[in-house]
Amino acid sequence: MTSHASPASPSRVRLDFLDVVRFAAMVFMVQGHTLDALVRADQLDVTAFPWNLWHALRGLTAPMFLLLSGAVGCLVLGRGADGRVPARRLLHRAGWGLKLLALGYLLVFPANRLADLRWLSPDVWRGFLQVGILQLNGLLLLVLTGLAALTRSDRAYAAWALGLGAALVLATPFVARVDCFACLPEALAAFLSPAHGSLFPLFPHGAYLLLGVGIGQALKGRSRDEALDRFLDICDFGGAAALGLSALLARGLPPIHDATGLGLAFTFSRLGFALLLMGLVARRAPAFAGAVAPLGRRSLAVYVGHLLLLYGLPWIHGVAQARYRSMSLAEGFATVALVGGLTFGGVAVMDLIQRRAAPLNALLRLSTAALLAWALVF
């Protein structure tokens, strides 16, 4: 081992409490998307209690996912004796980044066929190119893959990621003043600014994933119990520090209201509450790890599955297309149970097929890819 390589660490331990936290975030995400898409506004008024609290908590799911994605990505990053990440692993990560980008755009594909894209109006193109959480994840995975290739230790990798994350947070108010769409193509500007409807622009949302890399580095190489203790310390002290900084910047107590979502005080407030909520769930993780941790590892499948059920694709109608914000609260909760059951149940079945029927799993994947290609072309 060279002097630049990370110290040898024990064999990798699965930190199941991270999977439990991710599962909790998924449950809240599914019910949040479902109720928001289907329940009438007069029965779900996010300006009045208790739905204003529910709406604020919904805003924490994305930071939680991004923080956990960064942490897990760091935990599974392996290096050779010379400190380098093997080329095959780098290519695999880059491939995943491109797949996430493609999947993010596919879920909002605005035409029946690729050939029909030429007929789209500028407004439809603008909606199609809005950046969601999958596009943000894909871009940052490509960035972190490049960073992993350039660094020679996990410590350096995490330090650069933390530095970039801090830079994104601090630069957000300045980037918000720039008309990115006047000087960049729509597809690129949408990654930088929410002005045309992007829900997860790089500034500041990318910072959560990059800061998560630092969490992963703090847990790496530790036993499960040691890692859990360290994680709880990070969530408690980091959350309190972020909320304190938010209060200083806003000259008032969090939660901070910010209609744009781009202010420093709001970003630190959201980070602080997300960390505290993650710590709260992690404390209860040992009681539920055996039951829910396996599903927590399939966050991408759950995300895609419930969106398909709700919103469909150009060739498949979802529930929201027929009942958009027209249900009662009781009907909405019943649909939450249905969508959640089908999503998590479907993921569990697919996991079972993958483990016990590899040929069938390969056939299903190939068939899905072939049907998708046929739909896009013909």
For the regions a language model picked out, list residue spans one by one.
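Alpha-helical transmembrane segments and their immediate juxtamembrane cytosolic regions
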Residues: 2-378
